[in-house]
């Protein structure tokens, strides 16, 4: 026969002094938390050590591309709405459920 024994208190299982000992000094030390595993960027002498990204984000080019994409998307949505409205005008003899199924199948 197998006999199980249980500890009478939780202190018999684990010593209380070791259960909740957590080293939390790292969480409160901002320098160690953010910069412990990386290099110190304040030691850089000049900007030649960093990549040159001038001209990468040209605002006028990004604005024109965004405007072009937005206008094409708006035109596509308008065409879709017009097609759906014309379809619903011709399919008035169908039930509402069938029109809903046709909408999602379209």
UniProtKB/Swiss-Prot annotation:
Name the major location: other
Question: Taxonomically, which superkingdom?
Answer: Eukaryota
Chain spans, region BH3-like? 73-81
Q: Name one GO cellular component term.
A: presynapse
Give the InterPro entries listed for this entry: EGL-1
| Mutant phenotype after disruption | Mutants block programmed cell death. In an ain-1 mutant background, enhances the proportion of animals arrested at the larval stage, with egg-laying defects and with a ruptured vulva.
The record's subcellular location field reads: Synapse
Query: Which example biological process does GO assign this protein?
Result: positive regulation of apoptotic process
Key word Transport present: no
UniProt xrefs under Pfam families: EGL-1
Q: Which UniProt keywords apply?
A: Apoptosis, Synapse
Function, as annotated, reads: Plays a major role in programmed cell death (PCD or apoptosis) by negatively regulating ced-9. Binds to and directly inhibits the activity of ced-9, releasing the cell death activator ced-4 from a ced-9/ced-4 containing protein complex and allowing ced-4 to activate the cell-killing caspase ced-3. Required to activate programmed cell death in the sister cells of the serotonergic neurosecretory motor (NSM) neurons during embryogenesis. Required to activate programmed cell death in the sister cells of the M4 motor neuron and I1 pharyngeal neuron during embryogenesis.
According to the record's subunit comment, the protein's assembly and interactions are: Interacts with ced-9; the interaction results in ced-4 release from the ced-4/ced-9 complex. Interaction with ced-9 may enhance interaction of ced-9 with drp-1, but not with ced-4. A ced-9/egl-1 complex may recruit drp-1 to the mitochondrial surface.
Name this protein carries in UniProt: Programmed cell death activator egl-1
Origin organism is Caenorhabditis elegans
The gene is egl-1
């Amino acid at each position: 026969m197998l006999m199980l024994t249980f500890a009478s208190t939780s202190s018999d299982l684990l010593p209380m002094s070791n259960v909740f000992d957590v080293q939390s000094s790292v969480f409160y030390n901002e320098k160690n938390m953010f910069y412990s595993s990386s290099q110190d960027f304040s030691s850089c002498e000049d900007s030649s050590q960093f990549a040159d990204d001038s001209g990468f984000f040209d605002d006028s080019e990004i604005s024109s591309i965004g405007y072009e994409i937005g206008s094409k998307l708006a035109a596509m949505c308008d065409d879709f709405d017009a097609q759906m409205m014309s379809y619903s005008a011709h399919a008035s003899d169908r039930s509402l459920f069938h029109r809903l199924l046709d909408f999602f199948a379209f």
